[in-house]
Structure formats: structure tokens, C-alpha cells
Amino acid sequence: MARGPKKHLKRVAAPKHWMLDKLTGVFAPRPSTGPHKLRECLPLIIFLRNRLKYALTGDEVKKICMQRFIKIDGKVRTDITYPAGFMDVISIDKTGENFRLIYDTKGRFAVHRITPEEAKYKLCKVRKIFVGTKGIPHLVTHDARTIRYPDPLIKVNDTIQIDLETGKITDFIKFDTGNLCMVTGGANLGRIGVITNRERHPGSFDVVHVKDANGNSFATRLSNIFVIGKGNKPWISLPRGKGIRLTIAEERDKRLAAKQSSG
């Protein structure tokens, strides 16, 4: 009988979006427990070694982290398997680079560089609102932050903008039709569009219909929707492709056009 937490993760069982090949080893880095789920996070080691290529081995990543160069959401993190996740800001002071973890249209975390101005805040989805001891209202976000005394107008599924220096709420966006959103789970992972309507299904999952900038419509569960802007204006910079998923034929045409223009 297994006692205690699992300490290993086999490479074959690791999430597909980490893009680890099967044959280089047996194990993958098992993310530490933290603000994001194992299947929805990107451990620091994979970001630094496999994405940015700043290190060749896990030992080198450890040496980088132990010099306290890497900050996530403004806090120094020395754990190489720390689970960074959606909307997290990763800052490397030594190189002056800032990244925000955002999905591309294929559902992987893109290496998305942002300005130092944008690195000062992040957006969080409100997961839960409750009244704690002595009647103090609390709010819990998707990255496990608990904030006391929030604005009473903020409800579940809204998005709040958090100042990373202070951890305070600076602004919020209501979950409403006509607002820009990103899909953070399911088959449409990484797509961005405007919410057109919400079907309520009591006792089951509410379905949200979304329309992207090209006019394609798709539907997903409410739990997968993350509002990122008011109207058509996103509050964060978006990665290449702007969250519009192309069909296979469109991708092929785009590739051929790029090839011809360069060739």
C-alpha cells in the first residue's frame, strides 16, 4: 500500500504540453505542490532548460535558481520544480527579461516576453467567495491567493487585476457577454474570443459560447473560461497568433506563403 505523497513522475505520464521526448530518460521533473495543478503547470526547470535553453542540465538550473535570479510573481523562487502556471509572471533580473505564461492556440505555454511595466501586475480568476470568521469577506483566486475585504461587486468567475508588489486588487472585469476571454482547458485550450452567451444548466456544467476575431464560434464549459479584457480590449499583451486557431488547411497555406516570400 502506498503511504504518503508520490515523489516521481514518469516521462510518458508527464503532461503533453511540456513537450518532453520519450527516449531521453525515464523520469520527468515532478512539480512541487503549489498554486497550480500538476497537469496545468510548467515546472521552472522545464521553462529554463527546455524553453529558454539557459541551462543544459537540471544541475545548471539549480545553480541558476540558487543564486536567487529567478522571480515568479515578484517573489524569488529557488525550487527548480516550482509549479508556475497560467498568468504567472517570471522575471529574470540578471537579463532584464520578463515572461508571462500564456497558452498558445495549440494549448502549450508560449514563451511570451512582456515589458517591465506589464510585469507589475497579473490577472486572476475568482474561484470562490466566502465570509470568514467575524464576518470578514474573503475571495480565492485561481492561483490560490486569498484576499480579504474585496470589493463587494466582485463575484465568482470575474477576473481581478492584482498588483504583484502589494498583492492588492487594483481593478476587476465582470464575467459578462461581450467581454474578451481566453479558454484555459478542454479542446479549445488557448483560444481567445468574445463571450456571446452563457447557457445555464443547474446541476450540470454551464456552457459558454465564444466567438473569435475571425468569426469562428465554439463552446466550452464555464470553468474553462478566463476573462482577459473588457469589450475587445485585452488587459494583457497576447502571444503571436492572438489566440485565433487556424484550421489545418489555413496553417498549410500560411506556411507556404511564408516559404514563398522568404524563398
Curated annotation (Swiss-Prot):
Site of the Glycyl lysine isopeptide (Lys-Gly) (interchain with G-Cter in SUMO2) crosslink?
230
Q: Name one GO biological process term.
A: translation
Q: Provide the GO MF annotations for this entry.
A: RNA binding; rRNA binding; structural constituent of ribosome
Would I find Cell division among this entry's keywords?
A: no
Per its UniProt record, what CDD domains does this chain match? KOW_RPS4 (cd06087), S4 (cd00165)
Q: Which domain of life is it from?
A: Eukaryota
Where is it mostly found?
cytoplasm
* Keyword Metal-binding belongs to the record: no
Positions of the S4 RNA-binding domain: 42-104
Any one GO CC term of the record = cytosolic ribosome
Q: What SMART domains does the database record attribute to this sequence? A: S4
**Modified residue N6-acetyllysine is at which positions?**
233
Which Pfam family is one of this chain's hits? Answer: Ribosomal_S4e
| Keywords per UniProt | Acetylation, Cytoplasm, Isopeptide bond, Nucleus, Ribonucleoprotein, Ribosomal protein, RNA-binding, rRNA-binding, Ubl conjugation
Where does it live in the cell? Answer: Cytoplasm; Nucleus, Nucleolus
Q: Give the family per the record.
A: Belongs to the eukaryotic ribosomal protein eS4 family.
State the protein's purpose.
Component of the small ribosomal subunit. The ribosome is a large ribonucleoprotein complex responsible for the synthesis of proteins in the cell. Part of the small subunit (SSU) processome, first precursor of the small eukaryotic ribosomal subunit. During the assembly of the SSU processome in the nucleolus, many ribosome biogenesis factors, an RNA chaperone and ribosomal proteins associate with the nascent pre-rRNA and work in concert to generate RNA folding, modifications, rearrangements and cleavage as well as targeted degradation of pre-ribosomal RNA by the RNA exosome.
According to the record's subunit comment, the protein's assembly and interactions are: Component of the small ribosomal subunit. Part of the small subunit (SSU) processome, composed of more than 70 proteins and the RNA chaperone small nucleolar RNA (snoRNA) U3. Identified in a IGF2BP1-dependent mRNP granule complex containing untranslated mRNAs.
Q: What is this protein called?
A: Small ribosomal subunit protein eS4, X isoform
What organism does this protein naturally occur in?
A: Homo sapiens (Human)
Output the lineage of the source organism.
Eukaryota, Metazoa, Chordata, Craniata, Vertebrata
